[in-house]
Amino acid sequence: MPQLLTPPLSPLIIAVLNGNIEYTSELLQNGVDIDVRDKNGNSALHIAASKGYTKIATMLLLYGATIDAPNFELATPLHYAAANNYKDLTQYLLNMNANKSAVNKYN
């Protein structure tokens, strides 16, 4: 049976996963697709929120990342920040007008 391959991650997703602020900044300055997704529909902002990377999340939003973009489970970056108890990042996303009423597929 043939093996299914996972699509490669974009450089932006990799930079954010690794918490690499400098490379993330360089990619954004060079016009990378800011709303690129991984295999689960997570954007770079979802990943930053899930890891508590407030500086990277701020940078992504300054470059126009979609704050309420849902992934395949309808979760937004705010869901990830709140679920992981990243209080400062959760508050920042709320201050940036993230939809606090957004519902994912589990609630």
From Swiss-Prot:
InterPro entries assigned: Ankyrin_rpt, Ankyrin_rpt-contain_sf
Pfam families: Ank_2
PROSITE patterns: ANK_REP_REGION, ANK_REPEAT
Keyword terms of this UniProt record: ANK repeat, Repeat
Gene3D superfamilies, per the entry: Ankyrin repeat-containing domain
Domain of life, per lineage: Bacteria
Ranges occupied by ANK repeats: 7-36, 40-69, 73-102
Protein name, per record: Putative ankyrin repeat protein RP714
Organism: Rickettsia prowazekii (strain Madrid E)
Lineage: Bacteria, Pseudomonadati, Pseudomonadota, Alphaproteobacteria, Rickettsiales
